[in-house]
């Protein structure tokens, strides 16, 4: 999906002109890779979330250092091995660093060689990632906390939401929409 999107997306496409504060503005969409992306993923949905971090970074032309959760390192390790053995992605573009040391995520966020950080997980940890990354003024992309519970109002049509509610796993706390 991401490779196809990168090939067919209209980068460098002019957008419609707008007026802002009384002045005409010319806009253009430009593809500019962030650079080195540090990606920190949680334990739930590990394969999907690792791919959800890798795909956009690679499609944008970035290199990536992926740090999976300490509880689920093998999903990322297998993906890294498949990339190394089955793709033409050059060595060093995708880097997997698995560790049980939670300080590794903080090291990624703080490292001045990392240009952007993406994190999926708890709000408390996301705040810490943002705090540490701000010291080197890098881009930070956060998807935080389980906040997508099903809310069904009294006047809702039961037939309209029946099948959808069955797919709501983890009580809305699964970070699968990253």
Specify the residue positions occupied by each region the protein language model found.
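PLP-dependent aminotransferase-like
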Residues: 49-105
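Active-site-adjacent beta-strand anchor residues
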Residues: 40, 65-69, 97-98, 119, ...
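Beta-loop-alpha module in the N-terminal Rossmann-like domain of NAD(P)-dependent dehydrogenases
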Residues: 34-37, 44, 100-107, 121-128, ...
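Glycine-rich phosphate-binding loop at the start of an alpha helix
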Residues: 31, 48-51, 73, 123-127, ...
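N-terminal Rossmann NAD(P)-binding subdomain characteristic of aldehyde/semialdehyde dehydrogenases
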Residues: 1-54, 89-90, 94, 100
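A structured beta-alpha segment of the ubiquitous adenosine-cofactor-binding alpha/beta core
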Residues: 26-27, 95-115
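ALDH superfamily catalytic-core signature
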Residues: 85, 110, 116, 123-178
């Amino acid at each position: 999906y991401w490779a196809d999107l990168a090939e067919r997306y209209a980068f460098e496409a002019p957008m419609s002109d707008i007026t802002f504060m009384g002045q005409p503005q010319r806009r253009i969409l430009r593809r500019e890779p962030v650079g080195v992306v540090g990606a920190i993923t949680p334990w739930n949905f590990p394969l999907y979330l690792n791919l959800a971090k890798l795909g956009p970074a690679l499609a944008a032309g970035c290199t990536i250092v992926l740090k999976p959760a300490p509880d689920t390192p093998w999903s990322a390790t297998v993906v890294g091995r498949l990339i190394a053995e089955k793709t033409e992605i050059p060595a060093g573009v995708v880097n997997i660093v698995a560790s049980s040391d939670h300080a590794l995520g903080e090291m990624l966020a703080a490292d001045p060689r990392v240009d952007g950080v993406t994190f999926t997980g708890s709000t408390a940890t996301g705040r810490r990632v943002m705090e540490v990354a701000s010291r080197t003024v890098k881009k930070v992309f956060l998807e935080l906390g389980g906040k997508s519970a099903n809310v069904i109002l009294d006047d809702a049509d039961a037939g309209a939401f029946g099948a959808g509610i069955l797919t709501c796993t983890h009580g809305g706390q699964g970070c699968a929409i990253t």
